[in-house]
Amino acid sequence: MTRGFGPFGKIQEALKKAQEVRDGAQRLQKELEEMEIVGEAGNGLVKVTVNGNQEPLKVSLDPQVLQEPVDVVEDLLLTAMVNAYTQSAETMRKRMEELTGNISLPGLGLG
């Protein structure tokens, strides 16, 4: 309860909310590290897997794609990488928004 404490109550409430965000961020970090997001190209012939922090985990090539010219394989690999990275970055953005979206820090003009 912040009544009667004036600015001190607001500071205490802000510190409590900051701790909640910190705890949530730690949980989110672990969740992102464990997440696997797959980017594909060439109708699934090339797959790149990254975690929620955009760190590469695995590349998978269908043997059929190796019959293509090198430049085609390179383009497919790049497309799959960009796809995986984009999905991962969007997932991270949404999760961070969920974590901080409802946080307002009273009296500090931040919420």
Swiss-Prot record:
- Keywords for this protein: Cytoplasm, DNA-binding
**GO molecular function, one example?**
DNA binding
Where it sits in the cell: the answer is: Cytoplasm, Nucleoid
A Gene Ontology cellular-component term: bacterial nucleoid
Q: List the disulfide bonds.
A: none
Instruction: Please classify the protein's predominant subcellular localization into one broad category.
Output: cytoplasm
**Gene3D superfamilies annotated for this entry?**
Nucleoid-associated protein YbaB-like domain
Instruction: State the oligomer form and interacting partners.
Output: Homodimer.
* Described purpose of this protein according to its UniProt entry: Binds to DNA and alters its conformation. May be involved in regulation of gene expression, nucleoid organization and DNA protection.
What's the family? Belongs to the YbaB/EbfC family.
Question: What is the name listed in the Swiss-Prot or TrEMBL entry for this protein?
Answer: Nucleoid-associated protein CYA_1369
Q: Which organism is it from?
A: Synechococcus sp. (strain JA-3-3Ab)
